[in-house]
């Protein structure tokens, strides 16, 4: 794995990973997509049929497989880094972990009504902000770099990450 993006839902992980994949000519893996493929159903259906615990087990299994890949950019799910077992996988992935953040107000704006996001659709804006705050320590433990995305375009975020990767590679050489 060349790079892993973490952050709360709506922080820009999927959009930025797609831009990075194009710019760096690397495959892009979205962990939510990997979970849906493994379960043969969309995430809202997994939550409805099997519950969040089952989803988190599927997510862990998918993460374990994806981080083994030599090349690529991974956009994790918003809750992925919260589980300690996932933190260990991210730590041992030997890839820079970039945390994308946004303010609670910007997150609420981006998520809208939370359609397609089982947790967001059940929460008020205040509860969403509380969840974001509660997850922050887990995100911080994993991150090699944090980028606040509120006032940056996805392209600008991707360019910052590419600059970081160049510096990171120079220091590793």
Curated annotation (Swiss-Prot):
Cofactor(s) this protein requires: Mg(2+)
Alphabetical keyword list: Amino-acid biosynthesis, Aromatic amino acid biosynthesis, ATP-binding, Cytoplasm, Kinase, Magnesium, Metal-binding, Nucleotide-binding, Transferase
Top-level class of the enzyme under EC nomenclature: transferase
GO biological process, one term: chorismate biosynthetic process
One GO location term (cellular component): cytosol
Family matches, as CDD domains: SK
Major location category of this protein: cytoplasm
Classification via InterPro entries: P-loop_NTPase, Shikimate/glucono_kinase, Shikimate_kinase/TSH1
Catalytic activity, EC: 2.7.1.71
Binding-site residues for Mg(2+), renumbered to this chain: 14
Top-level taxon of the source organism: Bacteria
Family as reported in the entry's similarity comment: Belongs to the shikimate kinase family.
Subunit architecture: Monomer.
Protein name per its UniProtKB record: Shikimate kinase
Organism classification: Bacteria, Bacillati, Bacillota, Bacilli, Lactobacillales
Gene giving rise to this polypeptide: aroK
């Amino acid at each position: 794995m060349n790079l892993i993006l973490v952050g709360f839902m709506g922080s820009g992980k999927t959009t930025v990973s797609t831009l990075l994949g194009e710019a760096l000519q690397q495959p892009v893996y979205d962990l939510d997509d990997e979970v849906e493929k493994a379960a043969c159903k969309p995430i809202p259906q997994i939550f409805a049929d099997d519950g969040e615990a089952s989803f988190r087990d599927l997510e862990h299994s998918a993460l374990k497989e994806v981080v083994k890949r030599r090349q690529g950019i991974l956009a994790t799910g918003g809750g992925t880094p919260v589980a300690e077992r996932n933190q260990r996988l991210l730590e041992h992935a030997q890839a820079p972990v970039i945390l994308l953040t946004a303010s609670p107000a910007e997150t609420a704006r981006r998520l809208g009504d939370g359609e397609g996001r089982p947790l967001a659709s059940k929460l008020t804006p205040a509860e969403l902000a509380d969840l974001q705050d509660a997850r922050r320590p887990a995100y911080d433990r994993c991150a090699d770099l944090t980028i606040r995305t509120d006032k940056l375009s996805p392209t600008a975020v991707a360019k910052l990450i590419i600059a970081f990767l160049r510096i990171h590679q120079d220091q590793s050489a």
